[in-house]
């Protein structure tokens, strides 16, 4: 994939008039002739396919968009469950409401994975191109050590959720790592492309 191709694809995914909607990424582009507001697969949002897009965003280091995908899905699911107490099959782009089968187990895995990836201490996540050699937290989730290989063509992202105790230091092979604290305890760490069996250490400071 060339850089121009990557940017063009990201542009379509992020566009509020094409694929991205208030309830998540549409199954089809809303500018397509076969998009129907009252359609089934061609007019709604499912969660499962978005998980694959989310993981790919971690491969590309697109952490802001990855979080937007997860946050949008979690909020859409939360609103519907609080209103109806149902876990519907999909969400209508036009109404924001859930629809079709009301106890759809296929919604459960992406929701649980996104919730854990950003809000559950003791959780780590990466993209498809990153291989975890080993990983361990201490009992209080204030320290972490892991070894990771990024086999992708881009600098990827490793998400690690620590305890909400304060600030953390992050090292990559003993040197200061590039990372962002999205919020207290939730760290987004850059894994440089080509790194092999790289040691990540996180410590409460």
Model-inferred region functions:
Residues 168-170, 196:
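A short tyrosine-centered beta-strand micro-motif
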Residues 149-166:
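Surface-exposed beta-strand/loop patches in extracellular or lumenal glycoproteins
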Residues 181-205:
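C-terminal beta-strand-rich structural cap/linker in extracellular carbohydrate-active enzymes
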Residues 20-46:
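Generic long, charged, amphipathic alpha-helical segments
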Residues 1-17, 39-141:
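C-terminal capping/lid segments that line or modulate ligand- or cofactor-binding pockets
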Residues 143, 177-178:
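Short, isolated positions in well-ordered beta-strands
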Residues 142-150:
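Short, well-ordered beta-strand segments enriched in hydrophobic/aromatic residues
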